[in-house]
Amino acid sequence: MNAYSTDDFSALSEAPPLLAVRDLCKFFPIRSRGVIPKKTGDVKAVNRVSFDLRRNETLGLVGESGCGKSTTVRTILRALDFTSGHAYFDAAGDGRYVDFGELTARELIPLRRSAQMIFQDPFSSLNPRMTVGGIVAEPLVIHRMAKGAELERRVDEMLLKVGLKPEYKTRYPHAFSGGQRQRIGIARALVMNPRFVVADEAVSALDVSVQAQVINLLDDLKRDMGLSYIFVAHDLGVVRHIFDRVAVMYAGRIVEIAPTEELFGHPVHPYTRLLLASAPVPDPDRRRELPKAGEVADAGNLPPGCAFAPRCPEAGKGCAAEVPELLPVGPDHFAACTSAG
């Protein structure tokens, strides 16, 4: 297992990041029909994505359905194999980075202690044949981190942290509400004290009344346990208050990234402005004209140049000539747009 330092990749942050993603690509081949299928192209689900996740930060990854958010985080954690690129992770917190993309299946196993995932669906992500105690204890058992009384103590402690009673250990998932099931999933993800957690649409399947409770719980756990999150979301209004920074994705690329208040207050990329304008306003007396949405880009047949150009109200002749790079447009604010200044 090779070890890297910040000298091995260009820094996008002043302080050494916890995770540095560089030129990450995940392509899915398109094959023709027939007796002998031939590759005819690629679906570029994730296309040269680069960003840093800072220590004790919540980075929001937002965009429309199909833009590549979930594929990005699943590729980083090697639920999907890389097509190319790197994801440098400081697993031990000692400045020695490992690259998720080059690790073997055996080398990935100890990394799972430090990097975990909270899944979207609290109903299908829990084994209905296991008790709550068994579900939360399973990571500790697999990684041989605790047994006997110590195992029971850590499970009880984790259940209390997520707002569940230890006596629930003997019950099965079907006995709980959606919000309680998601708390069980959170307990399972955090019981090994990871440093980095992906929350993939972790509240989108819950009732609106429960979403705020789970979001606030995740924010409290971040402070208590020193966590760093990548939080995948499409409902900006629900999760805005826990994001430290926001990265906006479109057609497999990050088109803008900035601190939360900066991005919401001064969006630069036309797609970011469209996304923010499309968010519902909780005031029936406020009316506004919504921008024309247009057709979402096909990741298997992207147009030349900027993928958003066919939908962009500000598109010029140069937009179809080349793919814009993510460049600084302000302090800690980056955008991939030829008209950004």
Residue ranges and their predicted role:
Residues 77:
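Helix-to-loop junction immediately C-terminal to a conserved catalytic motif
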Residues 2-17, 31-37, 42, 97, ...:
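Short catalytic/signature loops enriched in Gly
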Residues 92-96, 149-167, 276-277:
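Conserved ABC ATPase "signature" region
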Residues 198-202, 206-287:
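P-loop NTP-binding/switch modules centered on Walker-like glycine-rich loops
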Residues 172-176, 180:
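Conserved ABC ATPase signature
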Residues 86-110, 147:
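ABC ATPase NBD Q-loop/coupling interface
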Residues 191-195:
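A short, proline-enriched helix->beta-strand linker immediately N-terminal to the Walker B motif
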